[in-house]
Amino acid sequence: MIQDSEFFRMEGVPITKEEIRAVSIGKLNLNPEDIVLDIGCGSGGMSVEISKRSKFVYAIDNSEDAKNTTVTNLKKFKIENCEVFLGDAKDLISEFDFNKVFIGGTQNIEQILEILKEKKIEKVVANTIVLENSVKIISKFEELRYNVDFVNVSVSYGKKINSGHIMLSKNPITIITATLK
């Protein structure tokens, strides 16, 4: 995994943290022939990491700052098998052929999941911070008859202080994995 500090960052544009990227990549179970859709690409951390492990990535975000930040990071890491799009994912999904999806954040999640089901997408991994969004996504996947697995990941970083070391926690992330039955 690329360290977070190596990515170009823009204020207000989120990035999936290194340890969360590692677990999410593992849950996607990528292979070199996969074509992946990254919805809510943010700073492009997942787009970069997925591109290194798959055939091609389509990245979408509705923020121009996020799109530009992702493009900058793709160039920085010399990634050529990823194309970035600005817009609403629910309006763009039908334009692409892909077999796996990573969702880092989006609006209209229930509509998007319905479209993914219609396209018979075999694996979707969605990361959430907000509990209500986790419940909404899990419930919708179950309604759509996906096999659903989820894990809540908490990461703490060590910091040296005068009297020793302490662990500083980051926000826990729920990683939801849905597999087509």
Swiss-Prot record:
Pathway: Cofactor biosynthesis; adenosylcobalamin biosynthesis; cob(II)yrinate a,c-diamide from sirohydrochlorin (anaerobic route): step 8/10. GO terms for biological process: anaerobic cobalamin biosynthetic process; methylation. Its EC number is 2.1.1.196. It comes from the Archaea. One of its GO terms (molecular function) is protein methyltransferase activity. It catalyses: Co-precorrin-6B + S-adenosyl-L-methionine = Co-precorrin-7 + S-adenosyl-L-homocysteine + CO2. It is an enzyme of class 2 (transferase). SUPFAM superfamilies: S-adenosyl-L-methionine-dependent methyltransferases. Keywords: Cobalamin biosynthesis, Methyltransferase, S-adenosyl-L-methionine, Transferase. S-adenosyl-L-methionine binds at residues 16, 40-44, 61, 89. Belongs to the methyltransferase superfamily. Archaeal-type CbiT family. This is Probable cobalt-precorrin-6B C(15)-methyltransferase (decarboxylating). It comes from Methanococcus maripaludis (strain C7 / ATCC BAA-1331). The gene is cbiT.
